[in-house]
Each structure stands twice: as structure tokens, then as C-alpha cells.
């Protein structure tokens, strides 16, 4: 489907940020491993998070869906799945459930769509081996499908920190249901806030995590079921905030907490540096802008999902925008550095691609771009449309993480149509 965005200005109103995708994944998986019943309130109901919910069900977990998800915890006693578990496009589910599969008896097979089957997994597979899990790529190339044989007993292991923080989160989530685990992080520790979110949810479910001198330690423990409310998502809110910054206006975004551990909250600092006015409350943010933006230099080492948003804002800004620290963005749904640069060039933007980012000279025009099947590209490029007009091909992919994206954008005055 095509998303056509018309020039829009003077955005105004109040809009609620959608629930956090990252926190929803972690909450439902940990609730599935807990003793007792948990209620996950205000979960993000989207393709990716439903992949995690359905993966939990494949291991015999009962989950009742409604306005909240009621999860009947297993206490770590998982059934062997009856069939291959298909995860769609959800890389988070793939990574987190690989270690969880090590808690089940016998074999589990995890796979997904064409994009998911290009996601690197070998560092996690190697790190699980010293902990008692035999896990391998069915094609012996480090990529899904992944075959996991249960047997996670615990122990000490090490893992590279420069490919995906989800590998670390994966082991930590399963760790308390073993004899105890030590994980030493080797090299550069990218996207650390995502691991902080994992630890946050683990501790909410009564499992402490120790981190010192580059090593995580988790002792044997029991997750305790509880009522958990999912906070708003700064990644998805970046499109709402970016829309106001780009088109101009004054908008209140609710459900964004000042004390959040989400690394993507840095988007507020970035748009402020570019020229927007940002006022933060305890649970909301007000963005005001004239639409006049200036280029910035940013390091997105801990917030790689912001790359498309910052790139398109840079294309609308006066002067140069430099983005660095995101080499790991090449291993997302697409090689986001390459695909972002290619689509910006379609719109007449001067882009220099770097190994870990890009340099953008502002000056985008309208036109037609392709999503490459990447939800974040599809949503980010709407911001150029608010100023110049744009058509985004294969845009329906936004449903992966933000199913009512067009409706929430139109709520604040953005003019767009999906057809």
C-alpha cells in the first residue's frame, strides 16, 4: 500500500504516545516465565509484540487477550513446542526466545520472514554453548532458522557487545531459572539502554541483576507475577515529535515519562538542538516549533532506531547533519544506513554514507520513496512529506510497531492517506 503525505503545517493538539514495543516484549516473556498470574496493562498490540505473545503460547503458556494481557506464568516449566515457531519480522522475539528455548526440553525451531532470516545470530549461539545449550543455524551460516536443544544449566560465558544488545538481554532473561549465570561483555557495549530496560523489567518481577566491571551476574531466583503497566515508546514518539519539529506547531505528547530508561528519549535533546522548543513534564512532553531547523552532529550509539528519524530531519534542516556511532544499524530490518541514504538521494539530498553513519546536506524535495519493508523508514519519511509532499511505497509495514500511526499523526493535523 502507498502512504501519501501532503504538505501540512501548524500542527496542534494532544496525542498519546503508543506503548513501548521494547517493554511489551520483555514484560510478556518474563511474565510467561514467572510464578503466578501477571496482568500486562496497556501492551503494544502490533505484529512484533504479538510474535512474542504467540511464541510464549507455543511453549504452553496461557495468555488471555483483552485491553490487558493476562499471562498465566509457567514458573519456568516450559512445554516443547508442537511445531516450528514462526516469528514474522520480529528480531527482538527471535533473540530473546532463543535463550528461553534453552529452558524447554527437546528441540525448538525458530524462524521468520525473509528479512528475519538475514539477522546475525552466531554470537548468541556461541555464548549459549558454555551454559549447556546446543543451538545452531539450520543452514550453518549463523542466520535463522535457529535450532535450539534444551539444557540451559547456567555457568559463565562471554559475548560480543558490538552486534546486538539483544543477545545479552536474551541470556539475562533466562538466567534466573538456571544454577546462575555470569555474562562478560567483550568489546564495545552498544545500545546499553536496551539492556537497562531488560534489567528494569527483571527487577520489577523480583529478580535482581548485578553488573560490575563488564560482567553481569544473575543468581538462581524466581520471577513473581505482578500487574505491570507498559510505559510510552520514545522510538515511536520520535515521529510525532519530529513531525512538529519539521512542520511547525505546538503539540502535547502524553505517556512519555521523564525518568524512562529508554535510550531513544535522546530524540528530545536532538530536536531541541535543531531548533524546536521542548518542555518536559513528569509524564508528558510539549513540542513547539517554527519548522525552521538547523543541522546537528549526533552519536546514536545507544539509540540506533532513531537513525531514520534524525536522517530525514537533517534532510529538512539548514546546513550539515552528521550521524555516527550506528554501524550496528546495518543489521536491522534492512541495512538502515544504506537504505536511508538511497531513499534520501531519490529526493535530491546530498548524502555521504559512512561505515557507522552518514553526512547529510539539507535540501530535500518531494517525490516517491520505498520502505524496503522497514517500518522505521516508512514512518520517518512521512516527515519530509509534511514539508514537501511525498508518497511512500509499501508503507503498510508501519503495523509492525505502530499500527495506528496514520491516525495518531492525523490527530495532530498531518494530512495523509493510505491507499
From Swiss-Prot:
Organism: Methanothermobacter thermautotrophicus (strain ATCC 29096 / DSM 1053 / JCM 10044 / NBRC 100330 / Delta H)
Transmembrane regions: none
A Pfam family matched in the record: EPSP_synthase
Alphabetical list of NCBIfam families matching this protein: aroA (TIGR01356)
UniProt keywords, alphabetically: Amino-acid biosynthesis, Aromatic amino acid biosynthesis, Cytoplasm, Transferase
A GO biological-process term: chorismate biosynthetic process
UniProt-annotated binding residues for 3-phosphoshikimate: 21-22, 26, 164-166, 191, 305, 332
Keyword presence, Transit peptide: no
CDD domains (UniProt xref): EPSP_synthase
Assigned protein family: Belongs to the EPSP synthase family.
EC number: 2.5.1.19
Name of the featured protein: 3-phosphoshikimate 1-carboxyvinyltransferase
InterPro entries: Enolpyruvate_Tfrase_dom, Enolpyruvate_Tfrase_sf, EPSP_synthase, EPSP_synthase_CS, RNA3'P_cycl/enolpyr_Trfase_a/b
Stated role: Catalyzes the transfer of the enolpyruvyl moiety of phosphoenolpyruvate (PEP) to the 5-hydroxyl of shikimate-3-phosphate (S3P) to produce enolpyruvyl shikimate-3-phosphate and inorganic phosphate.
